[in-house]
């Protein structure tokens, strides 16, 4: 049986736009986990805090479930898919209304050994 060299963590239906999440995820993809955490700590963005939590969860999964060493881990995959959209309405002039789409995201981070 092949040895497992990667671990994954997912946050589902997170109340942040997938597009804004992807902008942050593009910065950490391919980096070591120490560099990725440092980048996320200094990114002034709601998505960065959520992604940092997912990354820490993936690191913990790698260490506890598969016995991987934190120093050897890199972010091999990081992506955000569209979750369910919360549909709301904003009242407008003359009794009309405009739709507002509050988007959600499914954020996935995969860490693997170098």
Swiss-Prot record:
Gene Ontology molecular functions: rRNA binding; structural constituent of ribosome
CDD domains given in the database record: Ribosomal_L22
Stated name of the protein: Large ribosomal subunit protein uL22
Gene name in the database record: rplV
NCBIfam families: rplV_bact
Keywords from the UniProt entry: Ribonucleoprotein, Ribosomal protein, RNA-binding, rRNA-binding
InterPro entries in UniProt: Ribosomal_uL22 (IPR001063), Ribosomal_uL22_bac/chlpt-type (IPR005727), Ribosomal_uL22_bac/org-type (IPR047867), Ribosomal_uL22_CS (IPR018260), Ribosomal_uL22_sf (IPR036394)
Cited Pfam families: Ribosomal_L22
Similarity-based family: Belongs to the universal ribosomal protein uL22 family.
Role summary: This protein binds specifically to 23S rRNA; its binding is stimulated by other ribosomal proteins, e.g. L4, L17, and L20. It is important during the early stages of 50S assembly. It makes multiple contacts with different domains of the 23S rRNA in the assembled 50S subunit and ribosome. The globular domain of the protein is located near the polypeptide exit tunnel on the outside of the subunit, while an extended beta-hairpin is found that lines the wall of the exit tunnel in the center of the 70S ribosome.
């Amino acid at each position: 049986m092949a040895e497992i060299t990667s671990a994954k963590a997912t946050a589902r239906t997170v109340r942040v736009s997938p597009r804004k999440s992807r902008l942050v995820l593009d910065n950490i993809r391919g980096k070591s986990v120490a560099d990725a955490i440092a980048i996320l700590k200094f990114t002034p963005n709601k998505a960065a805090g959520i992604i940092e939590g997912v990354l820490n969860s993936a690191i913990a999964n790698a260490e506890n479930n598969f016995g991987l060493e934190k120093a050897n881990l890199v972010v091999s995959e990081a992506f955000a898919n569209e979750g369910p959209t919360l549909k709301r309405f904003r009242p407008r002039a003359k009794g009309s209304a405009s739709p507002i789409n509050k988007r959600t995201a499914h954020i996935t981070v995969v860490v693997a050994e170098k």
